[in-house]
């Protein structure tokens, strides 16, 4: 799956300051330069490039063109495990540390090797009228492919959400598991990719027809 990715260019802009990305991922190649979950690109700038990925040291990382926004201390090296990754963004938040939040398997990440909070009101290329890509760092057709498996990739345009919208703890096993999001306002460019249709892997199940 190293070279598989999906790309969409929205016809109209949504909220470039507030959004939530959720994805279930299972890694297969460790120590890759980058292993990208979601990216968007319009220009070589902070506002123009956004990449949610695992870095070459297997840390979860959010980077813009020239700034690493968040990089975890935690390493993600279990190739047998599914990780539920949530990146929740709201740059209008008055508390700087709440402008970008990472959650893994329902628990917020709080230990970071790098933290550069976005400025208040910072815009990103996410939800803008430029390429939005799942599984590749889309400033290049060969950069930072996911090298793993992905399931239930979702993006909610206009809301900074908790992981409990997309997952829940199993009452018997105590394991964090998928929960179908319901009652959501997905926003202009929101989508939910289940990857259930092999003939149309980019089929949007959110009801927004953002295929």
Language model feature labels by segment:
Residues 62-84:
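Short, aromatic/His-centered strand-loop micro-motif at the edge of beta-sheets
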Residues 2-3, 94-96, 101, 110-115, ...:
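Extended recognition patches within non-cytosolic domains
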Residues 1-5, 45, 62-69, 113-115:
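Extracellular beta-rich ligand/substrate-recognition surface
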Residues 9-11, 71-77, 121-123:
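Beta-strand-rich interaction surfaces with strong enrichment in secreted/lumenal proteins
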Residues 124-150:
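Extracellular glycan-interaction patches encoded by glycine-rich segments
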């Amino acid at each position: 799956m190293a070279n598989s990715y999906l790309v969409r260019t929205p016809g109209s802009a949504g909220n470039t300051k507030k959004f939530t990305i959720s994805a279930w991922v299972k890694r297969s190649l460790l120590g890759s330069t980058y292993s990208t979950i979601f990216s968007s690109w319009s220009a070589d700038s902070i506002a123009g490039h956004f990449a949610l990925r695992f870095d070459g040291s297997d840390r979860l990382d959010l980077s813009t063109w020239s700034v690493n926004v968040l990089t975890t201390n935690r390493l993600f090296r279990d190739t047998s495990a599914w990780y539920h990754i949530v990146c929740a963004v709201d740059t209008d938040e008055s508390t700087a540390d709440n402008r970008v939040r990472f959650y893994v398997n329902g628990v917020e990440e709080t230990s970071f090797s790098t933290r550069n909070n976005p400025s208040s009101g910072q815009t990103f290329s996410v939800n803008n009228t430029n390429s939005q890509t799942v599984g590749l760092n889309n400033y290049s057709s060969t950069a930072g492919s996911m090298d793993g498996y992905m399931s239930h990739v979702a993006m909610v345009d206009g809301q900074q959400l908790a992981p409990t919208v997309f997952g829940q703890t199993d009452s018997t096993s105590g394991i964090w598991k998928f929960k179908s999001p319901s009652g959501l306002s997905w926003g202009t460019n929101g989508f939910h990719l289940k990857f259930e249709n092999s003939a149309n892997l980019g089929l949007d199940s959110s009801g927004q027809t953002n295929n």
